[in-house]
C-alpha cells in the first residue's frame, strides 16, 4: 500500500487544502503524487474540470515515488490520521489520463497583479452564469476565449479563461491584491504560479495523451 510522509503539520494542512478544493470541484477527482529528485519535496497534481492541471508542492515524500490515489481517500487520510505516516488510499494509477509537463525548459514570460487576475476571473464567472450549456457548465468556446496575452523571453503566450477559472476554483490566488502571479512557458506548455499553487495547460490543442 502507498505511504505518505509529510514534513510537519503545516505541510499536511497545505496539501489538505489543495485536495479539499480539488474534491469540491470534482468529487471523483484523483490526485497524482510524485517525489522530486531531491527526495525532500513532492508534487501533487490534479486534473480540474476546466481541462487544466493544478499542482501544489509540499515538503514530504511518498512511496511508491509516483502514485495516483482517490482525492476523497487522500483527504480522509490527511484529516483523520494525525501520525507521521499517512495512508493515502489504494493506488489508482490507471485513472490518471493526463500528460504531465516537463520539469525543465521553462522560460519567464511575465508577472501579473493578483487583483487584475481575480477581477478577470470574477467577470468570467458572471458571463459563464449567463451562458451555461445543457449540462449546467459553460461552453468550451467561452472557456477557450483568450483573456490575456503576455510576452517575454521571445514568447507570446495567450491565457484562456479556463486557466483563470482553475486558479480561482482551486483557491490559489488568495486575497492580497498587491501580490503577483508568475507566468512561465515552454514551446508547448503554459504555467501560472500563484501563492497557493499553480495551473498548467498545453498552449496548443492536441489529442489527449495517456501516461
Identify the residue ranges that each predicted region occupies.
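N-terminal ordered "arm"
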Residues: 1-58
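Generic N-terminal initiation segments characterized by hydrophobic and/or small/turn-forming residues
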Residues: 36-39, 71-75, 204
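Short amphipathic beta-strand/extended segments with alternating polar/hydrophobic composition
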Residues: 45-46, 53-61, 199-208
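A broadly used, surface-exposed interaction patch
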Residues: 52-87
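Long, compositionally biased intrinsically disordered terminal regions
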Residues: 75-211
